[in-house]
Amino acid sequence: MHSDRLGAHHATEYHLLDVQRVAALGQRFPRAIARIFTEAEIRYCQKHRRTPFQYFAVRLAAKFAVRRLLGSGRLAEIEIAHGTLGNPVVMLHGKAAVAGVGKSLRLSLSHEGNVAAAFVSVECPLEVSN
């Protein structure tokens, strides 16, 4: 984590996942998908009928990276959605939302073949005590 002249902390985190491992998890334990992902995330991933687990894997990678940056929250409390321009955005619920107060999260997702990658950066104001 580093600070800038404007009085903010910046931190980054990335996570890589093997798509086949996520597919095996989903096929062996289908209820795990419902515990990890929101209904909106499940609908979005299942729209991609030929490669749904690439989409699940990249979202799971993002959830792991966000949780590591926040230090709190269940995976289901971290939702990966889309902004108005189609860009990935993080929506926080429950304890993750409390941990994320005042923090600006930016997200980049990528998947190619059997690898899913997520890069997350967070900016939060410095706390000044007198």
Q: Each predicted region: which residue ranges?
A:
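Core catalytic alpha/beta fold that binds nucleotide/phospho-ligands
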Residues: 1-130
